[in-house]
Amino acid sequence: ELERPSSEDHFSQIIPPPNVTGTLHMGHSFQYAIMDFYTRYHHMKGTDSYWQVGTDHAGIATQMVVENNLLNEGKSKDDLGREKFLDEVWKWKEYSEGKISSQMKRLGITVEWDKYRFTYDDDFCEGVNKAFVELYRKDKIYRGYRLVNWDPSLKTAVSDLEVVRQEKDGLLWHISYPLADSDEALIVATTRPETMFGDMAVAVNPNDDRFKHHIGKYVELPFVGRKIPVIGDEYVDMEFGTGCLKITPGHDFNDYDIGKKYALHEVDGVVQTSDKLEDFAPINIFTDEAFSNDMVPAPFNNLDRFKVRKAVLEELRNKELLVKEEKHHISVPRGERSNIVIEPKLSYQWYVKTEEMAKKANEAVNNGEVVFHPGNWDKTYFNWMDNIQDWCISRQIWWGHRIPAWHDDEGNTYVGFDEAEVREFYSLDDRDLRQEEDVLDTWFSASLWPFGSLGWPKETKDFKKFFPTTLLVTGFDIIFFWVARMMMMSLEFTGKVPFKDVYVTGLIRDENGQKMSKSKGNIIDPIDLIYGIDLEDLVTKRTANLMQEGLAEKIERKTRKQFPNGIDSYGTDAVRMTFYSLATHTRDISFELGRLKGYRNFCNKVWNAARFINNYPMESQEFVAKNDADKWIEDEFNKVTEQIHKNIAEYRLDFAMNEVYEFFWGKFCDKYIEECKTSGETANLHPMLKKILVLMHPFCPFITEEINELVFKDGSLMKK
């Protein structure tokens, strides 16, 4: 923990709060090493440096971990009920938080632990409620019936970030839809025949000579009898499939947009178009578990969606309406956490209106108030922000900030800080009120983190001094989900940007370039690199709490082959320096143990050089050049120091680390020390070592402090 200088200059940053789902992974440690570097570096320049630490409650992710733990005990969350289940989650949170803080301390990070925050602590809850209520009362939050990514296993809406695309070979079915009052038919091509019960139109391209004369006619939907219009829209690709596209607004995002454009709605078994958006009424054919509902006729109702597909195809064959089946490459959306196929589904959710907020956030980047490093990431930022949609902020789970809204028996909704404030604000009588069951998307509370963690909505000393923060270190994968939203919320509630510089790191992958994940069995705990771990413990760690069956054996085989002797201990400094050497401006970063060995050797070199110098008497701590070798090393030191400061300012720690390595090993050890040995002129060895220790300290704090104590015995380098 730093003893902070009383300086008007200040440097501040917030930790991207790790989820209380378990322990830290390599990506966390990589970013925290970078953040710790900048905290130490600015502190040593006499700047009041502050790094806000804390963890994230991580709604769905944490709830799933606890549900899986219960499952292993033969229990479910429904057996426990909401309150008892939440008690279990709080217990898990305490366990996980203990592990995480222990890991952070072992990485040597310099934070003030007594100012630790949690995105679900009492003060943070107050801030989250204030943000929600204020946005609602400014007409920037609303409740709407819209299409969302629905996870039928978790029975909740999930964000785009929590959906992964599985590319695979699938099938495209050509189905005959008879034209009403005609012997003709239109052949539609679809990868999802099971959704035909929700069809509300057939779309063709108005420039397609094959079909344009059918626009305005109706087709009869097989099995249902509903009459649906043939509409002309240039969205339809004439080259894809048959050129006729079934439009199912209740179960496809593109179809939803088309359905909305024509305000499709059903009246007495006939789907009509309208120029009034409020007429739009998409049809939902699935339950929350993705079973067919009562909108689907027998014998297809009350079946799992994939059984519906099978039954529909069989019946289409029987009726000779299945014209053709062909191979087709498809992209299947799966829940990142559940691995279940995501269903686009209509449901009531809460939304934030983002268009106006996004414009303000864009201005902040355009006018240089917020700068991305490397600069090319602002293109990614603008690409997302220029196509922003209203943000779905509700989740149908139990763990999280419960939405501060109450409903009465007549279907009215009231929003406020608590039930008493709601009754007062809306002048309500003693009618029964029920609180909204849904909780907020984790990203909603996370978007308040830069100012909420510093004390907002209270005007605390830290909030006044350290907000806006100086630097945000984050991964490119959450530029939109977190960075952009922090900017929108910060400008909305404080009128200021949340940070000035955004240092975007690449993602740490394994030596083969694969993403590190529990299911791939390639995760390495950074603490095991520091202290080492034997093979049996490593196997146990990698195969524990796997959420998918059958993986343990495969992961065990892979681990035994890759690490026959377990993992050696490399020490904190070698791990940190390896991370800095990897802090390139590339998107993907491969982590190799060979590089780690190189930096452990470097630490040994530093230690041996210091011990060698310590054999000589210390004549002075002040460097005064007495010969050509002294002048040369002084000149080289000044040049490398200037270059390193430049690299640090430009967020190129990879270049800076390389400069340190090359200077210490190649110039100081191999040339200057050897020259001093030969000439016997050793008076400047101690003073130059001292300068180097100060320069190197943010890169390798432990060994530099230990050497300084051994050789100079004059207190911490952090005070130099």
Can you say where each PLM-predicted feature lies in the sequence?
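Structured ligand/cofactor/substrate-binding pocket environments in proteins
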Residues: 27-39, 55-56, 124-127, 185-315, ...
